[in-house]
Amino acid sequence: MKLRPLQMSDKTGGTGDDTSILTKTRSKTQRPPLYKVLLLNDDYTPMEFVVHVLERFFGLSHAQAFEIMLTVHKKGLAVVGVFSFEVAETKVAQVMDFARRHQHPLQCTMEKE
């Protein structure tokens, strides 16, 4: 018994001179939208508490946290990070809950990038 490679014409019953090409299109995977997490300034939350929040919930160094805290203080708000929806939502909830438990009016929000 002699084996030979299977050709496209073998499936369709053609003569073997079929020159059609099969193409497979790939749909491009769409990236999920990203969300900015923002801290808003207020006149009551101590600066050191804001620095602590940035270090604890966003993994920033003390120097990075201090810079963002100063931006919030001077400009009224600052972008802390950009995340997927679920991560941004969780970080906002964690910050807001932590601020409330410590009786600070610190506001943290998210918006689509």
Swiss-Prot record:
InterPro entries documented for this protein: ClpS, ClpS_core, Ribosomal_bL12_C/ClpS-like
Signal peptide start and end residues: none
GO BP: any one term: proteolysis
Role played: Involved in the modulation of the specificity of the ClpAP-mediated ATP-dependent protein degradation.
Subunit and interaction comment: Binds to the N-terminal domain of the chaperone ClpA.
UniProt xrefs under HAMAP family: ClpS
Family: Belongs to the ClpS family.
Name the UniProt record assigns to this protein: ATP-dependent Clp protease adapter protein ClpS
Species whose genome carries this gene: Cereibacter sphaeroides (strain ATCC 17025 / ATH 2.4.3) (Rhodobacter sphaeroides)
Source lineage: Bacteria, Pseudomonadati, Pseudomonadota, Alphaproteobacteria, Rhodobacterales
